[in-house]
Amino acid sequence: MARPDLHERISSLRKLRVAQERVRVRRQVGRRDGVRLEIDGRWLTGFCSNDYLGLSQQFEVVAALQDAAARDGAGATASHLICGHHTAHETLERDIAEWLGYPSALLFGSGFIANLAVQQALLSEEDDVCVQDRLNHASLLDATRLAGCRLRRYPHLDVEGAMRQLKGAPEGAAMLASDGVFSMDGDVAPLRALSLVARMQEALFYVDDAHGVGVLGPQGRGCVADAGLGVAEVPLQLVTLGKALGGYGAVVVGEEALIRHLAETARPYIYTTALPPAQVAATLAAVRLARRDDWRRTRLTELIGTFRDGARRHGFELMASDTPIQPLLCGEEATVMAMSAALEQAGFLVGAIRPPTVPEGKARLRVTLSALHTPQQVQALVDAIVQARDVVSRQPQRALA
């Protein structure tokens, strides 16, 4: 039997994506100024980034990056366990652990890498199981598959479903893993109830709080702190550095023994170059600002209210989200693509999210807000969405859900 030809395979898959109008494209950003982006020679107001606190271009953050780059160069030049672990890395790990109330922390190159590292290092036996919310981020779900342990999923936010899945897999070590804030819906996991399930079933509870830290909880400490939980209930927690903190990378905070085990055994940590010290210095500055500047969270909360009030007045279907992620359901893919195109024509860049990222029939505009937006910009976006809906609804077989 002849082997499949990989070029023929990818050609067939490409043709299928084209037929389904599911080809993904990259937009080239020429320049950026706060929430404004230059794309194809036009300046657009962006409502699609994860820079929730507006820190990525903040003066102190950029100055810290420039100063460290002038001193330490462009890269770490080695992995953490060779000679790539600089003083800045150690300081950032310590500061984030202290901020979140955890004893220890470990830096990673990205949230995807960190989620893989956690599961590969802790769930190494065939009988081990990771129980997950069905709408968890792809990095959590893919990490389980790559780690080689069993994956069991429960319906979104279904605490009883999580209990059933853990009870149904009594052999081997168990982890219960959940997003804190769900990236496509913007809702928050029932962490207190899930922590009780994990304790009852002797499972380690792991929370990926990529979209919560910096935004929610006292001093922006995230979903876990906002739920009144800590290391006793959530022994491991993921924090990404490329969203509210405006930089790049990720940190896992947790019990000292667990973090030490990751540092000594997690292959994605051991066999990769450490983050550039200059990037780490920028994140150190961002952490200080995120902890100090409650006004950023206050403004963000006000802007979320402005958007939701305006959308409700015009009859839009909102999801149960009080976070900067505000999805507007559009239903069919053709509708959301037409809406997104109409908004861009009006001067706004809003992400169109469609299957397979979200379920069939649940395509949506994913509006994300930043503390740098103004109330006037948010109101202008709402007005533009109303106009786009009116235009699109007049087109055959295209109506908002």
Curated annotation (Swiss-Prot):
The modification N6-(pyridoxal phosphate)lysine is found at residue 243. SUPFAM superfamilies: PLP-dependent transferases (SSF53383). Its cofactor is pyridoxal 5'-phosphate. Its EC number is 2.3.1.47. Pyridoxal 5'-phosphate binds at residues 111-112, 183, 211, 240. Disulfide bonds: none annotated. It comes from the Bacteria. Substrate binds at residues 24, 137, 357. Pathway: Cofactor biosynthesis; biotin biosynthesis. InterPro entries: Aminotransferase_I/II_large, AON_synthase_class-II, AONS_Archaea/Proteobacteria, AONS_Proteobacteria, PyrdxlP-dep_Trfase, PyrdxlP-dep_Trfase_major, PyrdxlP-dep_Trfase_small. Keywords: Biotin biosynthesis, Pyridoxal phosphate, Transferase. It holds the Pfam family Aminotran_1_2. GO terms for molecular function: 8-amino-7-oxononanoate synthase activity; pyridoxal phosphate binding. GO terms for biological process: biotin biosynthetic process. It catalyses: 6-carboxyhexanoyl-[ACP] + L-alanine + H(+) = (8S)-8-amino-7-oxononanoate + holo-[ACP] + CO2. Homodimer. Catalyzes the decarboxylative condensation of pimeloyl-[acyl-carrier protein] and L-alanine to produce 8-amino-7-oxononanoate (AON), [acyl-carrier protein], and carbon dioxide. Belongs to the class-II pyridoxal-phosphate-dependent aminotransferase family. BioF subfamily. HAMAP family: BioF_aminotrans_2. This is 8-amino-7-oxononanoate synthase. It comes from Xanthomonas campestris pv. campestris (strain B100). The lineage of its organism: Bacteria, Pseudomonadati, Pseudomonadota, Gammaproteobacteria, Lysobacterales.
